[in-house]
């Protein structure tokens, strides 16, 4: 009898594993939203908690308020603000991880300079990470991993990007054997073409993409007008060069890409940006942007010992691989993986912050997972706010937890994004309630 039960249990586990391996991009089955069954876990002294987070406004690359501001200055602004807000001595930090995509060496030198500009002593170590568009979230995962393995009890996870001042589109030195592998060759497909591939392969119409983009703009405009971003944004005073080359001092205090006057008619007039007859336009794609964000994490016991606030708890993190030529579908596979690790379903989540690299891929992921539209990016996403590559993941964490705090009740939220070359990342956070 016990042998039969053991075989049944083993078969069940095998079916679960096969279920995760199935449902890849070729499958048409969607993740079904199960009835809400969330039970909040007991607080543990070993929990990795988010203490606090801040971000800069997001500037329009090449023409906005940060077009002449170096990334070390953007990063220093948020590092300084987070430490000052919670009155934490900088020498208490066990490590700093900074996500960056476009700077040489993932911005390792730039980030260390920013550390010193922020008054953080040389005794605090720092590393840089580049997992493309998930770099900011990967920094969060890296710091959380260090806390979990006992390397330290408190650390700072950041993301930063100056797309104004960085060289985009150069893959670096690569093998002459590239043509021998379809997947290797697909890693060089322009991101806009991967968006077109998703739209064509999964039937995401131009009208649906434009409607999604309009909703993003409308939500962001509403949030901005209500002051919803005020608590998370660090105003940055900087200098900008005018058309004559003269320096002017300005203070950037809100996101520059939000366009309240956006209409479906206006979006419909935009030409395809990446190929003739395509459906991906400047209006239904993320904006090229500048910005930085920082998130302070700690072991719960250390946060309590230091009298620090607890804004959220990191419950799970997952990264998955998908075909490079349709890289935008990554969240559709990363989110279920992260939810499973947390023991949750789609219905248990109040807010999904899914990066809007392109409306095509964001829509695909939302529809594939059966996520109610009202749960997706309630304050707008990258189409309206902008997408400073290395910053985005950290920015999403800050925005998510601040919005859950505004709502007040205990709840779960998800941060997710697609990743160039074919990946997706997702993390589940719990807001503990007011």
Curated annotation (Swiss-Prot):
MF terms per GO, please?
A: acetate CoA-transferase activity; acetyl-CoA C-acetyltransferase activity; acetyl-CoA C-acyltransferase activity; acetyl-CoA C-myristoyltransferase activity; palmitoyl-CoA oxidase activity
Any idea which UniProt keywords this protein has? Acetylation, Acyltransferase, Fatty acid metabolism, Lipid metabolism, Peroxisome, Transferase, Transit peptide
Q: State the coiled-coil residue ranges.
A: none
What reaction(s) does this enzyme catalyze?
an acyl-CoA + acetyl-CoA = a 3-oxoacyl-CoA + CoA; 2 acetyl-CoA = acetoacetyl-CoA + CoA; tetradecanoyl-CoA + acetyl-CoA = 3-oxohexadecanoyl-CoA + CoA; hexanoyl-CoA + acetyl-CoA = 3-oxooctanoyl-CoA + CoA
- Which EC number(s) are documented for this chain? 2.3.1.16, 2.3.1.155, 2.3.1.9
- pH dependence (record): Optimum pH is 8 with acetoacetyl-CoA and 3-oxooctanoyl-CoA as substrates.
Return the Pfam families for the record.
Answer: Thiolase_C, Thiolase_N
Q: Which residues form the active site?
A: 133 (acyl-thioester intermediate), 387 (proton acceptor), 418 (proton acceptor)
According to the UniProt record, list the residues that bear N6-acetyllysine: 183, 244
Residues annotated as transit peptide in the record: 1-36
Q: In which pathway does it act?
A: Lipid metabolism; peroxisomal fatty acid beta-oxidation
Where in or outside the cell it occurs: the entry states: Peroxisome
Q: Is Acyltransferase found in the keyword set?
A: yes
- Region PTS2-type peroxisomal targeting signal, residue ranges: 11-36
Is Transit peptide one of the keywords? yes
Which PANTHER family has this protein been placed in?
A: 3-KETOACYL-COA THIOLASE A, PEROXISOMAL, 3-KETOACYL-COA THIOLASE, PEROXISOMAL
Subunit structure, briefly?
A: Homodimer. Interacts (via PTS2-type peroxisomal targeting signal region) with PEX7; leading to its translocation into peroxisomes.
What role is this protein assigned? Answer: Responsible for the thiolytic cleavage of straight chain 3-keto fatty acyl-CoAs (3-oxoacyl-CoAs). Plays an important role in fatty acid peroxisomal beta-oxidation. Catalyzes the cleavage of short, medium, long, and very long straight chain 3-oxoacyl-CoAs. Medium chain straight 3-oxoacyl-CoAs are preferred substrates.
Family of this protein: Belongs to the thiolase-like superfamily. Thiolase family.
Q: What is known of its domains?
A: The PTS2-type peroxisomal targeting signal, which mediates interaction with PEX7 and localization to peroxisomes, is cleaved following import into peroxisomes.
Specify the protein name.
3-ketoacyl-CoA thiolase A, peroxisomal
């Amino acid at each position: 009898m016990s042998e039969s039960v053991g075989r049944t249990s083993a078969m069940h586990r095998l079916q679960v594993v096969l279920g995760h391996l199935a449902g890849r991009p070729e499958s048409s089955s969607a993740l079904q939203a199960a009835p809400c069954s969330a039970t909040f876990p007991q607080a543990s002294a070993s929990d990795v908690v988010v203490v606090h987070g801040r971000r800069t406004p997001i500037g329009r690359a090449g023409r906005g308020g940060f077009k002449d501001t170096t990334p070390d200055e953007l990063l220093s602004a948020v590092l300084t603000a987070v430490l000052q807000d919670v009155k934490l001595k900088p020498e208490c930090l066990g490590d700093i991880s900074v996500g960056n995509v476009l700077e040489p060496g993932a911005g390792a030198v730039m980030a260390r300079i920013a550390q010193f500009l922020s008054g953080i002593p040389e005794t605090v170590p720092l590393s840089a990470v580049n997992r493309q568009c998930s770099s900011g979230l990967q920094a969060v995962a890296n710091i959380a991993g260090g806390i979990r393995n006992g390397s330290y009890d408190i650390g700072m996870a950041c993301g930063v990007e100056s797309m104004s001042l960085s060289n985009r589109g150069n893959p670096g030195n690569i093998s002459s054997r590239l043509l021998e592998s379809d997947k290797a060759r697909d890693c060089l497909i322009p991101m806009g073409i991967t968006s077109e591939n998703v739209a064509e392969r999964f039937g995401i119409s131009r009208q649906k993409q434009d409607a999604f983009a309009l909703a993003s703009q409308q939500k962001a405009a509403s949030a901005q007008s209500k002051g919803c971003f005020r608590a998370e944004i660090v105003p940055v005073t900087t200098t900008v060069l005018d058309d004559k080359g003269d320096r002017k001092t300005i203070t950037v205090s809100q996101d520059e890409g939000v366009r309240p006057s956006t209409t479906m008619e206006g979006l419909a007039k935009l030409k395809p940006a990446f190929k003739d007859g395509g459906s991906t336009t400047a209006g239904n794609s993320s904006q090229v942007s500048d910005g930085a964000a920082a998130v302070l994490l700690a072991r719960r016991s250390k946060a309590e010992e230091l009298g620090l606030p607890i804004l959220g708890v990191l419950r799970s993190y997952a990264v998955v691989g998908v075909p490079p030529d349709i890289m935008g579908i990554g969240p559709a596979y990363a989110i279920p993986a992260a939810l499973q690790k947390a023991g949750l379903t789609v219905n248990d989540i109040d807010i999904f912050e899914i990066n809007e690299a392109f409306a095509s891929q964001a829509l695909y992921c939302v529809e594939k997972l059966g996520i109610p539209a009202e749960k997706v990016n309630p304050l707008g996403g990258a189409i309206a706010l902008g997408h400073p590559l290395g910053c985005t993941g950290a920015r999403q964490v800050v925005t998510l937890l601040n919005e859950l705090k505004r709502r007040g009740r205990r709840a779960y939220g998800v941060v997710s994004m697609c990743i160039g070359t074919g990946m997706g990342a997702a993390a589940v956070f719990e807001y503990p309630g007011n």
